[in-house]
Amino acid sequence: IRQTSRRLREKNDTDILRQTSVTTASGELTLAGLYALASYPQGSRPALAATAAVILPADAPGRHQNLQTFDGPLPEMLSDMLRWTERNLPTTAYYGDDGNLRNAPIIPLAMVREIIANALVHRNLGPYTLGLGKSIQMRILPDRLVIESPGGVIGLSIHQLESSEHAQAAVNQRLYNIVRHLRTPDG
């Protein structure tokens, strides 16, 4: 962050953490700081976890398979959820230009990563979701990926959502400001 903000370039670590809302003035982690950086934010906020499962067809014996709960800081959850999705997403076979048969997920992984990242970063962190234990739910069905993220779309109109023009509204501005400076192994 020192490289991107001349205002913070000369600040010490404590001041930077406070001024970027990672910590409070007394040094305690904020909710955004906890979710983004703590080793196990689910200890004090269990709803910050996410679950994923492959939903079986109605005629199959059982409801789901490969149920997994994801925890840890937001960047690690993103990486773990993406790896799980890559393992469980159905694939299609196609012949490449070189004549070799290849398998590709039914949804491009770059798109999946963006969807998961948006669900994690833009989820509602208010008392009516966290306090009620609402967490992110990801489900793979035979023909689609469904991600339910607590809360709603705040700051965007239906017209903006339906438009091809880019519209942006950070639901959790402090969290977004923190995680935009973080990196995962895949970027």
Task: Give the ranges of each region predicted by the language model.
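Active-site "cap" helix and flanking loop/linker of ATP-utilizing ligase/carboxylase catalytic domains
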Residues: V171-R174, I178
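Active-site helix-to-loop segments that bind/position phosphate- or nucleotide-bearing substrates
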Residues: I1-L130, I136-L145, S149-A169, L182-G187
